[in-house]
Amino acid sequence: MARKALIEKWNKTPKHSTRAYTRCRICGRPHAVLKKYGICRICFRELAYKGEIPGCKKASW
């Protein structure tokens, strides 16, 4: 239940725009969020390995 309450809280627009911050759309993690995709690095890595992010592949050099 606490998770549902937090999700509802994040979806509301804040009173002042400076209070808004990025959170992962999948797990809700507040840190290490990639703005381009809107997800955290951990979720990004999982989705990239599954091939669910188009145009993304593992780097090797």
UniProtKB/Swiss-Prot annotation:
Entry annotated with the keyword Nucleotide-binding: no
Coiled-coil portions: none
Annotated Gene Ontology cellular component terms: cytoplasm; small ribosomal subunit
Co-factor: note: Binds 1 zinc ion per subunit.
Annotated Zn(2+) binding sites: 24, 27, 40, 43
Domain of life: Bacteria
Example GO BP: translation
Record keywords: Metal-binding, Ribonucleoprotein, Ribosomal protein, RNA-binding, rRNA-binding, Zinc
GO MF terms, alphabetically ordered: rRNA binding; structural constituent of ribosome; zinc ion binding
SUPFAM superfamilies documented for this protein: Glucocorticoid receptor-like (DNA-binding domain)
One Pfam assignment: Ribosomal_S14
Keyword Endoplasmic reticulum: no
Cofactor section: Zn(2+)
Protein task: Binds 16S rRNA, required for the assembly of 30S particles and may also be responsible for determining the conformation of the 16S rRNA at the A site.
Assembly mode: Part of the 30S ribosomal subunit. Contacts proteins S3 and S10.
Family: Belongs to the universal ribosomal protein uS14 family. Zinc-binding uS14 subfamily.
PANTHER family assigned to the protein according to its UniProt record, in alphabetical order: 30S RIBOSOMAL PROTEIN S14, SMALL RIBOSOMAL SUBUNIT PROTEIN US14M
Descriptive protein name: Small ribosomal subunit protein uS14
Gene from which this protein is expressed: rpsZ
